[in-house]
């Protein structure tokens, strides 16, 4: 068990947390939620001891081991992948290295023998004999193939490093597991594997995530941060939402009844306070009036941007025809003879672990990259807008947000642009920020603003939910459900994909799988699973 006792954290004059008391117990998974800036990641750092609270303390059951998902992707560059995972249990790793050093000695002494015996006992107690196989199981489950297990971390790309660091956090059955955005940069297959792992994990988990489906799947409780307090709810994310809305509704109804009672008492007092025969009753009602306290109902600190895509023209029946597109980058064949045709009602989600292939295809269709072979043709009634996964190149200038967005605005009017930005949660002086210093979430909101202004009737969106908070994801999700024309997108947010897409495509090493269905139907379809397996086997045979 881990608990926060009267924890207060002040940053300058602001209290990020004020007298927080909460217990996280064994066998439960707690989803830590709150608006951007509420302090979710900071609270995890307080629990792990990285940040010292201004007041109060953190208590952990003696002897329990705490494990944290680390965010530094370069810290273990000089370690092999398998060793990095085993470092999740630092004591076990130290024992393994000390044992190896002793047994490598040429002049093995009696003292060495005694020490080796001690180490072997501790090694066995920590399940050391299963360490490498357990680490390999975690890596394979997350999609890190066996041939990479003995590679050095510096040889891996960013997405692979994220998976290794996650495996490190999960390794060795920790008593308390702290996970900050564990689904970031994971493909949907890896997320599904992590969901099953956490569902079957018997110890304490505290997780921060913007993935609503993930929180619904794994959480037994929700800890909601708002106004420097943390309120604990039993149940998953959807249950929290319904419970919190019901609580507010009940408080409003109770306040309404109290206000009616106050009005009734005030009218009686005003009418009869000067009446000698009624003075006792008036005095009694004054006392009753003084006892009535209205519940304080604070509006949630959560804010939702206004996202609404409106095409400027209707789209015809001919939308997009792709014929035999192939692309190899750095010696890796990402696209192999890909062909498909889009209709005017298609909302296509590209799924599967081959995210680089999807990015390459989107760049080709957006005109930013040439295919090695094949061709594509957009319909004459289509207008396209593109959301790249990496938007760095869009934000290198010294322009303010207002000036940056003005380039894409149909109305060259500062008041119009500021109003538009206000709906996207850039208020007051936010519009004067230089775009080259914006956070990831701010950049995404700028890109979405640009796309809304385009009035396009066809959208390409490569991971638009990355860097967004839950409120912004919800707003984008609802907008794309309503979006009346063609959409090609990819996202690692299960609920986002399930509620938006009506057609699923998967770019496998052996070719394209294409199915007109929802994402859940695709996952449950045995025929699609067999087809995926056959295509992967054919690709391996060709290699």
Report residues per predicted region:
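ABC ATP-binding cassette signature C-motif
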Residues: 1-255, 309-543
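A structural signal for long alpha-helical coiled-coils and helix-turn connectors
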Residues: 103, 241, 270-273, 277, ...
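Extended non-transmembrane interhelical loops and adjacent amphipathic helices
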Residues: 113-116, 186-187, 283-294
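Proline-centered turn/helix-capping motifs that create local helix->coil transitions or kinks
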Residues: 130, 277-281, 291-301, 377
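Short amphipathic coiled-coil heptad-repeat segments
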Residues: 136-142, 267-271, 287-292
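ABC ATPase nucleotide-binding domains
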Residues: 251-265, 271, 278-287, 303, ...
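Short, flexible cytosolic linker that couples an ABC transmembrane/permease module to its adjacent nucleotide-binding
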Residues: 298-314
